[in-house]
Each structure stands twice: as structure tokens, then as C-alpha cells.
Amino acid sequence: MKIIANRMQVNVGQEAEYKRRHDEIWPELSQLLKEHGIHEYRIFLDEETCALFAILMVENPDRLIDLPSNPIMQKWWAYMKDIMPSNSDFSPVSTELKEVFYLP
């Protein structure tokens, strides 16, 4: 099992909408993520800066390689692009975070 952490951003004033959309996550997207070996996925919001911190546990990171080309994933990204910085393929602008501490 590998833990992956990322930093993203939600546009100022769109925090509640971001949460609402995730509270209503599409069942097909949830299923897709699980099928790709994701067991836990949490996103935290820093309300002062609108920074998002995502943490996910995945069986094997190699299983995530084809996720960006999946039509469900692409549709979700297109749905989210109006409330967060996005790349040209509509994926969220994201920076992988380096683990610097772990308490077993």
C-alpha cells in the first residue's frame, strides 16, 4: 500500500461549491477510483489560503496510469474546472507532496 499526497487549489469563494460537489460524488467515479486500487481518499481545505491537500492510499501506483484517459475521470475534471485551477486537459493543477514524517 502506498500513500500519495497532493496539493491543489480551489478558487476563492468556491470552497462551499467544491465541498458540495464532492459530497455528491458520482457513484461511477467512486467505483472507478476503487477499481484502480484506491482505498482511502481524503481532501482537506486550508480555509485561509484555499489550498487543498489530498491524501490517498493506493494498492499500486502503476494502476493509476490510465486513470486520466478514462472518460469518467475526464468528465469529472471538466465539471470541476470552473472552480479550481486546471491544466489544458482539465485535470486540476496539482503538486505531489513529499512525506517528511510518519508515526507508525
What does each model-found stretch correspond to?
Residues 30-53, 57-59:
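Short, glycine- and small/hydrophobic-rich beta-strand elements in well-ordered beta-sheets
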Residues 1-3, 49:
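A general secondary-structure signal for short beta-strands and their flanking turns/coil
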Residues 11-14, 61:
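A short, flexible beta-alpha/helix-coil linker loop
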